[in-house]
């Protein structure tokens, strides 16, 4: 009796069963599939502990969805895949296409080693490189026209969920599930496809219709909190886009998804910008060297309560509100005069939802050096941002308990209230008003008030 026809499904950033075109192709290509996740030593070495703990949980939950058939392998990718193809007589390896620099190079190496990769779908509603200017077919460098073309391009409806997946049962030696533990005291969001779908359902029922008004308020549950699920492909952006209507709130949410896709497109077309300045002249600016002030920023002890609350949330939960990401980034670059890469690396170390494109270009947007960037002369005021987006101080009280007893009128500027005990909360490490002017002076030195074309 001949062996059944088999195909390999190589999971990477698509840890789900539903709306997974690559998985459907793998199922269609054979009578049985060999599901595999290959632990990448290089990525593991650079990842933070919370990021890895989340991934470990997600892999076990994916395994449950595959009836305990997920191969979790350690080794060089082409060697692992070649061994599996030989062992199971599998003809094809199915993947979702990756577009980030590392993933692209990895897949090219695997193919160069003679492993046939069948690409179907990607982590995006519209794959990077597909949305181009109709006039000359070049990539967009500004978000707004990109968004218009992205919307016109459109996307497929969510793919069906397979009902009966026949998988090859792995050997025990192929079940190398990592035991990555959270740091003591840390707490992260629930992982897995089921948690992603449950969170999406909750957000649709409780937050989506008010998203345009609530998304910037740090103290409330006003955002989708789906970023980690999107990072690991536990839910696909198609699933989020499909039910959206034309209301202002729904359109605002759709635009936030488009920002993620825009940054992926920018990095795909400018792969060096994960570490380098998109606008090179900003590399010429005078920057300070990291010192104890940088450490205070990392520790959430800058003396600015809104900044400190955000940094403590990041370290404790591996997540931070998008509004506060911008505020702490501006503080690092424009109050402490440090290069954005230092902050981006710290985010990489702690964010559960770390995504190289969104992280690098989110930082460059705030720093003023990126495409479609916030002008460098725009400096977020950490005091006014707190008053505006945490007016009652509830967010600060949650993460800076030293100040929990302060009133809404005093919690944002505790240094003005010397008669109140602040439980050894640190004094300000810089004066924002002074450092804002210093940033503008340094900007004048490079004689630019906005980023220029990186190829100029």
Predicted regions and their residues:
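Short, contiguous strand/loop micro-motifs
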Residues: 9-10, 49, 212-213, 297, ...
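A broad detector of short, well-ordered amphipathic alpha-helices
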Residues: 24, 308, 433-437
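Trp/Phe/Arg-rich N-terminal binding region typifying the photolyase-homology
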Residues: 1-158, 249, 358, 441-446, ...
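Active-site-proximal binding-pocket segments
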Residues: 221-402, 408
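Residue-level preference for long, well-ordered alpha-helices that form the structural scaffold
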Residues: 51, 55, 299, 303, ...
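Short coil/turn segments at secondary-structure junctions
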Residues: 46, 294, 423-426
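Glycine/tryptophan-enriched, flexible segments
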Residues: 136-282, 389-456
């Amino acid at each position: 009796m001949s062996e059944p026809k088999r195909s390999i499904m190589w999971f990477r950033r698509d840890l789900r069963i539903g709306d997974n075109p690559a998985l459907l192709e793998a199922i269609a290509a054979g009578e049985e599939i060999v599901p595999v996740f290959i632990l990448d030593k290089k990525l593991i070495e650079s990842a933070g502990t919370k990021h890895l703990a989340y991934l470990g949980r997600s892999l076990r939950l994916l395994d449950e969805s595959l009836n305990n058939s997920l191969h979790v392998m350690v080794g060089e990718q082409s060697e692992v895949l070649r061994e599996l193809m030989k062992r199971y007589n599998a003809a094809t390896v199915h993947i979702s296409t990756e577009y980030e620099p590392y993933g692209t190079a990895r897949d090219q190496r695997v193919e160069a080693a003679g492993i046939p990769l069948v690409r179907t779908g990607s982590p995006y509603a519209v794959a990077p490189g597909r949305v181009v200017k109709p006039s000359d077919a070049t990539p967009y460098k500004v978000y707004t026209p990109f968004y218009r073309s992205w919307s016109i391009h459109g996307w497929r409806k969510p793919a069906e969920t397979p009902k009966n997946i026949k998988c090859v049962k792995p050997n025990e030696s192929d079940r190398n599930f990592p035991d990555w533990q959270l740091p003591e005291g840390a707490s992260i969001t629930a992982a897995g496809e089921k948690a992603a779908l449950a969170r999406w359902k909750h957000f649709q029922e409780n937050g989506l219709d008010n998203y345009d008004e609530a998304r910037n308020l740090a103290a409330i549950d006003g955002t989708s909190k789906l970023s980690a699920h999107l990072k690991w492909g536990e839910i696909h952006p198609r699933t989020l886009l499909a039910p959206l209507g034309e209301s202002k709130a729904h359109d605002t949410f759709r635009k936030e998804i488009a920002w993620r896709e825009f940054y992926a497109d920018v990095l795909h077309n400018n792969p060096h910008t994960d570490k380098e300045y998109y606008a090179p002249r900003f590399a010429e600016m005078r920057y300070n060297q990291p010192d104890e002030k940088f450490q205070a920023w990392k520790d959430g002890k800058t003396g600015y309560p809104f900044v400190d609350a955000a940094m403590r949330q990041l370290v404790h939960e591996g997540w931070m509100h998008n509004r506060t990401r911008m505020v702490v980034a501006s503080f690092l670059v424009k109050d402490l005069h440090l290069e954005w890469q230092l902050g981006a690396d710290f985010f990489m170390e702690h964010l559960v939802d770390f995504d190289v494109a969104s992280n690098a270009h989110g930082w460059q947007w705030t720093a003023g050096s990126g495409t479609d960037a916030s002008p460098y002369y725009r400096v977020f005021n950490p005091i006014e941002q707190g008053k505006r987006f945490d007016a009652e101080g509830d967010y600060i009280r949650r993460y800076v308990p030293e100040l929990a007893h302060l009133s809404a009128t005093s919690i944002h500027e505790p240094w003005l209230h010397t008669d109140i005990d602040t439980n050894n909360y640190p004094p300000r490490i810089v004066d924002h008003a002074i450092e804002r002017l210093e940033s503008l002076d340094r900007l004048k030195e490079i004689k630019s008030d906005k980023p220029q074309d990186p190829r100029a």
